[in-house]
Regions:
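Short Gly/Pro-enriched turn/cap motifs at secondary-structure boundaries
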Residues: 3, 48-51, 222-224
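Short glycine/serine/threonine-biased micro-segments
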Residues: 6-8, 74, 151, 157, ...
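Acidic/polar, glycine-enriched structural segments that form the non-catalytic walls/loops
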Residues: 14-45, 50-51, 56-157, 251, ...
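Aromatic-rich carbohydrate-recognition surfaces in CAZymes
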Residues: 66, 158-163, 167-178, 182-279
Length: 289
């Protein structure tokens, strides 16, 4: 095989079986309290395509009365040479390495989520806003619909409108991350003012084909611009400048997707010039703009 998928760490417990489909793991007429995968002790070793996903692994170990053991699994996909270098980090002192990295992860998220905190009489409401709403906004920002579009084969890049909208949810939590993504999406705006309906993962500002080119249509399956894609830059840039006070951002020079460059202000102006004649032809879900 050319790729690693998963690997037991430390006192290696060989992975016996796995499952990527939630319904198969839970089983018919079963639920989270009695999943058939746990009852049977074995899984179907099948992945999942465009259904409800899960990640389940089984391993066999023996415990003496009162004994407990900890297991660690490294899950992901890399080419063999890259994967072996990652796995090597855990070959010595696996437990200490895992504990240290877990603490680093906890510290990272506490830091990210601490930038905006509310306090109301409702602990549940506080937790929803301070933790889960914010965390969900980060996940949406980072993954940009990957689970719902990319992994099921419906998209092979970033959706312009989706990605620009997602930035708004983290501006108050991570303004520098937000600014970098705004710059990225501005660089995916064509010099005519429209946004690339699909921004490739290999995006190369200043050198991209556009929906006007047969090569772009063939590669992405998108034969036309959307009327409102680039217009979503307006509320996003406005919210970033309002939150940070960084008015100089408007004067930054950023390349267009296919050729030329312009200030952020010029990008916004061209978005209006492109879209004003295309009003009333937008995604029904986003007509509020």
């Amino acid at each position: 095989r050319d790729y690693y998928a998963s690997r037991g760490l430390g006192d290696v417990y060989k992975r016996q079986s796995w499952c990527g489909e939630k319904e198969a793991f839970l089983g018919r007429y079963h639920g989270y309290g009695n999943p058939v995968g746990v009852i049977d002790g074995k899984l179907n070793c099948e992945g999942n395509y465009n259904e409800n996903s899960c990640g389940a692994l089984t391993a066999v170990l023996k415990l003496a009365p009162g004994e407990k053991k900890e297991m660690a699994f490294l899950v992901g996909m890399k080419k063999n040479d890259e994967a072996e270098a990652i796995v090597a980090r855990y070959d010595q002192n696996c437990q200490q390495v895992c504990e240290r990295e877990l603490e680093e992860l906890i510290s990272y998220w506490h830091g990210q989520l601490s930038h905006f905190q509310i306090k109301t009489p409702s602990n549940e409401f506080n937790t929803m806003i301070n933790t889960w709403n914010a965390y969900n906004c980060f996940m949406t920002f980072i993954w940009s619909r990957a689970a719902s579009f990319t992994y099921c084969g419906l998209r092979n890049g970033y959706g312009y409108r989706d990605t620009v909208q997602d930035i708004q949810g983290v501006i108050h939590l991570a303004p520098e991350m937000a600014a970098d993504k705004i710059r990225f999406m501005l660089s995916a705006q064509v010099d005519n003012g429209g946004g690339l309906p699909l921004v490739k993962f290999t995006h190369n500002p200043g050198h991209e084909d556009t929906p006007d080119d047969a090569s772009y249509v063939q590669e992405t399956g998108h034969p036309a611009y959307r009327a409102d894609d680039a217009l979503w830059l307006f509320p996003t840039v406005y919210k970033y400048v309002s939150e940070t006070g960084n008015v100089d951002f408007i004067d930054e020079v950023i390349p267009f997707a296919n050729k030329d460059e312009g200030t952020v202000y010029e990008h916004l102006k061209r978005a209006i010039q492109f879209s004003i004649c295309l009003l009333y032809t937008s995604d029904a879900a986003d007509e509020g703009l």
